[in-house]
């Protein structure tokens, strides 16, 4: 691939509308990304998060001022990031439920499958999935309000559902959810 284009084994050209399921925002083989990756591989390919490394520290210094937070956790996948968020919500609230949306996708690990709103992904593992995920229709504030209980630890939603059919919420959806969470 190059940029937004990819080619199959027969040379047919396609526009990659998936962009690596939204992780290839720069396209394929972007020169700045290729150079940065090559430079990093020449120094250090991977270390556990047990060790500090200069690129991670420099990125955190740039990223954190853009947020209301004073620390971050690097994850290697969406599933790992989502598992971390779920565990933090459960641990620090002491509560047992997380509200999620129908047709959502949060990963393929057991915990993130439990949060995923696609029965076909969960079905083979139903008897082994963790409990506590309350599913509501996407873009439905009233359903979220009705689902909230004394055990609600978090509301876990995608800004735009991909697996659910590229569902874009109303402009006020996340503002209203933020207000609900602040209450």
Give the positions of each predicted feature.
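A short acidic, helix-capping loop that chelates divalent metal ions and anchors anionic groups
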Residues: 45, 108-109, 163-165
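Short acidic, glycine-rich surface-loop motifs adjacent to enzyme active sites
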Residues: 151-166
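Beta-strand scaffold of nucleotide-dependent catalytic cores
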Residues: 15-18, 146, 178
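Short, small-residue-enriched loops and turns at beta-alpha junctions
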Residues: 23-25, 143, 162-166
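PLP-dependent aspartate aminotransferase-fold enzymes
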Residues: 62-154
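Glycine-rich loop-to-alpha-helix module at the N-terminal edge of alpha/beta enzyme cores
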Residues: 13-99
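Catalytic PLP-binding core of fold-type I/II PLP enzymes
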Residues: 149, 167-183
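Active-site and channel-lining beta-strand-loop segments
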Residues: 1-16
């Amino acid at each position: 691939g190059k940029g937004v284009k990819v080619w199959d084994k027969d040379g047919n050209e396609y526009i990659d509308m998936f962009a690596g399921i939204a992780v290839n925002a720069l396209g394929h083989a972007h020169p700045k990304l290729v150079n940065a990756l090559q430079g990093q591989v020449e120094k250090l390919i991977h270390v556990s998060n047990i060790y500090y490394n200069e690129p991670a520290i420099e990125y955190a210094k740039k990223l954190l001022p853009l947020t209301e937070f004073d620390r971050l956790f690097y994850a290697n996948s969406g599933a790992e990031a989502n598992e971390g968020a779920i565990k933090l919500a459960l641990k620090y609230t002491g509560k047992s439920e997380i509200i999620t949306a129908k047709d959502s996708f949060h990963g393929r690990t057991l915990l993130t499958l439990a949060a995923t709103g696609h029965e076909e992904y969960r079905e083979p593992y139903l008897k082994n999935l963790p409990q506590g995920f309350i599913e509501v229709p996407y873009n439905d504030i009233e359903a979220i309000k009705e689902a909230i209980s004394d055990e609600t630890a978090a509301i876990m939603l995608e800004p735009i559902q991909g697996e659910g059919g590229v569902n874009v919420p109303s402009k006020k959806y996340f503002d209203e959810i933020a207000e609900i969470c602040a209450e």
